[in-house]
Amino acid sequence: MTKEQILVDVQEAVAEKLGKDVSEITAEKSFKDDLGADSLEVMEMVMDLEDKFDITIEDEDAEKLATVGDVVAYIETKL
């Protein structure tokens, strides 16, 4: 799976969870500051992405994933 494919999958998951248009979800966007996600929504997205990619994202790592790009890079290392 390429980085671009991961980004598309993450964009779709984030857009669905937050009720945003996929075009609003770019790698540079911060979940909390730019996309308005609260802590619960971020944790739910992490769980959704764990299921989608069949990976485990440790809690201490999840806390460091501030942007969409951070998540894509992290998932890339786990695949």
From Swiss-Prot:
Functional pathway: Lipid metabolism; fatty acid biosynthesis
UniProt-listed SUPFAM superfamilies: ACP-like
Modified positions (O-(pantetheine 4'-phosphoryl)serine) in chain numbering: S39
GO cellular component: cytosol; membrane
Cellular localization per UniProt: Cytoplasm
Post-translational events: 4'-phosphopantetheine is transferred from CoA to a specific serine of apo-ACP by AcpS. This modification is essential for activity because fatty acids are bound in thioester linkage to the sulfhydryl of the prosthetic group.
Role: Carrier of the growing fatty acid chain in fatty acid biosynthesis.
Name of the protein this chain belongs to: Acyl carrier protein
Organism: Exiguobacterium sp. (strain ATCC BAA-1283 / AT1b)
